[in-house]
């Protein structure tokens, strides 16, 4: 059985990259002062809708604010967090690796990582789902039994969501054939028979390309199937059931139910509140210039973003912005402080855990067990 690995100112990235020379100089960060005119943001690989809308937002900020933003693509969670940690990008936008980095889970439960002091700076939401070939016999999630299901390599966020959707269908990885494949190669894998389905954000360009060559269909979630939804949310608590339209394999005006969750822009806590506030202000102030740029950029709007933290705290600069918009509640403040306190507890606990292991290499399973026993 497979184990479950359970806008921004464009200038910041370029600024950071210019500081990472071969002379070993310390990369620049923005620990104080405003958002720089040049910066980078790491995100999913080309061909994904996350890359497309991140690029579209970056281009809009470049045009409207004179920023210079570089988008750095990667198909892996580590590949999207590492540039930010190493000073090659000021921001990152990806899947649940921001949660795993915060908690030091899965690929981050290793000596060179441990708990990361991550903060959320903007929280757009987006739909994700599973697509199959029409006539394949895969019409529902329970039909995945015995089928070749993608196991997105080095991408615990996607692995988690696919695990949750299998649970929705009453299945586990023991019931399917797990196929190692990168997130960005899934659509091509369906074409050549390597996998039977693809899981992605629903507006990815690779899905439109797949639709142009084959008859395809979406596997739908039923929000009224409370038991199935509960099983799914038990595995992926940051998600909810919503609907989307205007995607591949849809007629005009058709709506399809899917898995929804935030795909946030993140940074480290050390980034200045002024810089993050500048980013939030720019994203809000220029929304009309990118709202219709891609099918998912509407999810960057103020009425669509997540306004209460759940598993990772919001940055002080983002909190300041939400307060100015009368969107920051007492409930949100209480939860945010709980999460900030948890990060402090996690970093202390990580050191204690490493000492208790007496030189043994840390790993996800033993660290998770240690947390369950020693942290509330």
Sequence positions of predicted segments:
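Pocket-flanking alpha-helical
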Residues: 53-60, 70-112, 130, 138, ...
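Bilobed "Venus flytrap"/periplasmic-binding protein-like clamshell domains
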Residues: 36-64, 69-70, 127-192, 205, ...
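Pocket-lining segment of extracytoplasmic ligand-binding domains
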Residues: 96-98, 104-109, 136, 173-175, ...
